[in-house]
Structures are given as C-alpha cells and as structure tokens.
Amino acid sequence: MALWGGRFTQAADQRFKQFNDSLRFDYRLAEQDIVGSVAWSKALVTVGVLTAEEQAQLEEALNVLLEDVRARPQQILESDAEDIHSWVEGKLIDKVGQLGKKLHTGRSRNDQVATDLKLWCKDTVSELLTANRQLQSALVETAQNNQDAVMPGYTHLQRAQPVTFAHWCLAYVEMLARDESRLQDALKRLDVSPLGCGALAGTAYEIDREQLAGWLGFASATRNSLDSVSDRDHVLELLSAAAIGMVHLSRFAEDLIFFNTGEAGFVELSDRVTSGSSLMPQKKNPDALELIRGKCGRVQGALTGMMMTLKGLPLAYNKDMQEDKEGLFDAFDTWLDCLHMAALVLDGIQVKRPRCQEAAQQGYANATELADYLVAKGVPFREAHHIVGEAVVEAIRQGKPLEDLPLDELQKFSHVIGEDVYPILSLQSCLDKRAAKGGVSPQQVAQAIAFAQARLG
C-alpha cells in the first residue's frame, strides 16, 4: 500500500506506478534508511511519541531487518513497493504490527531521503578515498622501480625534453592527490544532517536535531528546513569530483595506450588486462585502458544531467529530485571500477627501458640544453633559441643527433661553443640540470617519491 493513499479515490494507473516508482535504484539506500529510522525512533522517545519499550522493540526489529538486507539484498527488488522508505516501513509493520505505523510521526520522505542519500555518500566516498590512495600507492611503487627509465616527455605529442617514467607516474600521483582532497572537502560540506526538517517547514515536534545528527554520525544539523530538503549541492559537488577524477584516469589511460603502441613501444601491458581480436591472431588490445577512457564520458554526462535537472527547480522538494540517484550511483560505481582497474594495469606493466632510452635520444630533446649552454656563455636567450633552431635544422639535414655534430660545425652557428658542450648534451645532464623543486632530476624525483610515501603512510 502507498504511504499517501488516503487522499485518493482511484488507484494509480499501473503505467504511472512504474514510471513513478524508484525502488529499482533507491534500494541501494536500504541500510541508510534503516539506520536513519533507528535514530528517528530514539528522537521520538525524547518528545513522548514512543515509550522506551516501544523504541526498543522497533530498534530490535530494524536491526534484524538490517542484517536480513545485508545477507540478502536482492529480496528488496522482489517487492512492488514504491520506494525504499515504503519497503522498510512495510517490512517493519510486518514484524511489529501497528507499532510500526508510529515510526513516521513528524518525519517526511523529503528529509528522510535527503538524510539517506547523505549517509550513502559518506559511506561511498570512504570507499573511493581508499581506492584512490591504493592507486596512488601503486603509482609511487611503479615510480620507485623506474627512476632510471629515461623516456621522452611530450608537448603537442611531439618529443620535447627527456623525463623519466618515474616522473610521469608522479604527475598522476599529484592529480590523484587533488582528487582525494576534493572528496575530503566535499565530505565536510555534506556532513550536516537534514533529518527533522520534515516536508519543508520543519517538524512540529521539539526534537533536538543536533543530538539526532550526532546519533547518525553527522558533524551538525542543517540550519534551514527549506534548503535542507531541496539541497543537492553535495550530489553536484561529488559528481564534479568524479568527473574531474575520471578526466585524470582518462588521460592516464590515453598516455599508456600510446606508450603501449608498436610505434612507441615504451611499455607492455599484462595479458591480464588485455584482449585479442576475433580475426587477427597477433593482436593484443589495451581494452582495460580503452574502457577507462571511454567510461569517462558517462560520468561527465551524469554531472551535466544533474545540473540541468536542478537549474530551474523552485523551493522546496520536487519529484525531479528523484533523478539525483541513478546518475550519482552509476558515476561512483564507474569511478570506483576505473580506480581499481588502473591499479591492476600498473600491477603487471613492463617498462621497456632500452626503447624508452632510444626514443629519448631522438627528436632533439636536448635542444633546450644547448640553448641554456649558450645563455651561460653570455648569449641572450632569444638569440640562443634562434641559433639552436638553425643547428637542429642542420642536424636533421645530416640525419644526426645534435651531440654527433662535430665541433667545427657547431661553431658555425656560434663561436662560443666549445668542447665542453658535449657533456651538456647527454641525457643524464639534461635530467640532472632540472634540479629545482618539482623537476625531473634524480634527486627531485627521489624526494617526491619519499614525500608521497610519507603522505600515503
């Protein structure tokens, strides 16, 4: 039976019921709905609606139901209840009879679902933070094992300057650390309880909402009932964090897809995260990474969809807000799966050091070093830049790297060039000179690894 049937003289059309019902997705809030109901039953004792004995009976029944749901969650979807609140209340009435009908006193599904969703978000963000830190740790470990793997760094997908595979890994550690921080910040803002705000104007019972918030593990209670039941900022904020996090994972995937190509050949992915072709026997496709890259779009879509849903809603609650859950649930599921998969990809990756080194030595990645060398000899940088550009053109014409041009040919471009230029043009020198904080020098990379290890514990 619907929770609101008394006002109506006709039954809902079955097509409307199917359109309106949300149990098929909000069943995921079952545990939070039960936990919230236990806390609400305690609050009802403080205002004389329930006796201590009645509350104990309700709490015992709700705890039994909670264990039952954890053991067999699929039972919820066997019901034709409208939503998870109706299902929980129906099951409670089955267990304790008429007493179960007293539990909803002073409470609306509006503040109830807002509370359930915030509790779910807190639980799920905790899982995401764990997965995020696990991936950071995997990246740090990969970096530690590849500090000497020199490879080309890219701008515009053109070889630019030499870096190391470790430095590349640490770039993604920084991105993931920001994702972690965004989630932690979002938790601070959603950690306020809307329970006790009723439908929109507050509850008529003098419940201590701060005490109630504490029972549920919230830092405090919300301050305005109208805002409380219509606020979905936390959904937008978490979807935004997910969207940004998935952009980072998509870029991570794209880099490794490129590194894994036959043309680059910097890494080889494990058989455990690749698949073959139904036609071409030789193929080993980076499906795990391509799926991470592909799934990024659906998370961006969830954020955009939720913004469009909320942008024109008047205060307070509107049924449009039922659309807050499916996109959020899917986005969080997707992000969590991709974090785990990215860590699995790293677990079996092989870095091909000789090929990385060979590629780093090509493409005139040491051209900037020659320009800096000229600057150290007193040549203005803009002039040095032009000189080196001309030298690169000549090296390309001869099919040689810069360091293989004889001294007399280099001196045609600038008389200040001497024999001391050749050590400067080595890959190791290119790395060693980048010793400012955040640079690719071995010392800076080692410090960055140590810092990340200390932060991650």
Swiss-Prot record:
What InterPro entries does its record include? Arg_succ_lyase_C, Argininosuccinate_lyase, Fumarase/histidase_N, Fumarate_lyase_CS, Fumarate_lyase_fam, Fumarate_lyase_N, L-Aspartase-like
Q: Which reaction does it catalyse?
A: 2-(N(omega)-L-arginino)succinate = fumarate + L-arginine
**One GO term (biological process):** L-arginine biosynthetic process
- Report the superkingdom from the record: Bacteria
- State where the protein is found: Cytoplasm
Q: Which GO terms describe its molecular function?
A: argininosuccinate lyase activity
Q: What is this protein called?
A: Argininosuccinate lyase
The protein's organism comes out as Shigella boydii serotype 4 (strain Sb227)
